[in-house]
Amino acid sequence: IFTSEQGSAFFGGKWTCYDTGVHAAAILRWPSKVAEGGVSDALLSYVDVVPTFVDLAGGNPAELDLDGKSFAALLLGKTKRHNEVVFSVNTTRGIYHGSEAFAIRSATDGRWLYVRNLHSDKKFQNVITHKEPIFASWKTIDTDFARSRVNAYIKRSAEELFDLRDDPWCLKNLAGKKETTKAQALLSRRMDA
């Protein structure tokens, strides 16, 4: 198995819980066991890797105190789904030019992404906001869109909800909208469970 550390390092990616920040690539090769050329959009999490290895080695992950669950059945072609919801966390603590802490939590079912910014009363900061000439140049662009992106990067709402089907870059926060109440409530409850 080979995986990337996180999603992209571009704006709205690394140091966030938006889809481009947590959607990581994974490649697996196991000749005669896993079908060659297969692709899956099943929801997996890094915490599922160890239980999977335990399972494939003949152990019983259920007997261990592990957070994840084995995706061996997915690898072996016995199912196409794995998790109904996956969770991500980012604290932005101890990073270069970062805030003392800026805790972010998210939950996704693959269609909807719910983000909870636990320090929404503070400005988000990191090396990009302090040293990157690209971010400084964005602040000079005098358009509504540019201003909204800069503001969204440094000032986060307490709750955010994105429709990943229509808005994969997580640009339009739908939290609190009447038409998305059900999705937001469901993912918020799952996060609290």
Predicted feature locations:
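A structural signal for well-ordered alpha-helical segments within the folded catalytic domains
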Residues: 44-51, 66-69, 109, 156-159, ...
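Substrate-binding rim/cap in mid-to-C-terminal beta-strand-loop elements of soluble/periplasmic
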Residues: 11-65, 69-84, 172
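Metal-dependent active-site segment of extracytoplasmic phospho-/sulfohydrolases and closely related
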Residues: 1-10, 57
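C-terminal, low-complexity/hydrophilic appendages and adjacent surface loops
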Residues: 18-19, 93-176, 182
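Short, surface-exposed recognition loops and adjoining beta-strand edges that mediate ligand/DNA contacts
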Residues: 66-74, 85-102
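Low-complexity, Gly/Pro
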Residues: 25-27, 178-185, 189, 193
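A generic secondary-structure signal for well-formed alpha-helical elements
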Residues: 31, 56-61, 75-79, 111, ...
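Structural recognition of the beta-strand scaffold that forms the well-ordered cores
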Residues: 1-3, 26-28, 45, 52, ...
